[in-house]
Amino acid sequence: MVRRIFVEKKPAFAVKAKELKNEMSEYLGIEAEDVRVLIRYDIENVGDETYEKAKGTVFSEPPVDDLYEETFPCKEGDFCFTVEYLPGQFDQRADSAEQCVCLLNDAEHPIIKSATTYVISGVKSGKWKVESEWQEAVVKHCVNPVDSRRADGPKPATLEDRFD
């Protein structure tokens, strides 16, 4: 069974979100009311007890992070998209999480994949005539096509890599 967690820095600690909001304004001319950055973890082969321990130790720091399971709150009209590493690309965050979960229970062999989810709220069009144009510009700014891609599909049934 694949479990999904989203981890977001609390507003006072959301440095990456503030940086992206400034970059959108300065480089793209897009003014947004709010920008959120969440780290998405898909987790498989982890028992319930280990999973509960890992939520507050491996995947998040409770004093500075908000953790959401399976989905996260967003408002109608928010533009949400997710960026993941290309298949075969090394994912250091996921690898570190796998190693840390193994320290909690060395009998388990977790498979973890991470991605970054962006939520853009309250954009004032400005120079952009069509909503899809500014959305495309933001996605292009956040996705490095050399190592990553947009990943907005449903949660996978398994995280095991299959090579046909």
Report the location of each language-model feature:
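Core nucleic-acid recognition elements
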Residues: 1-164
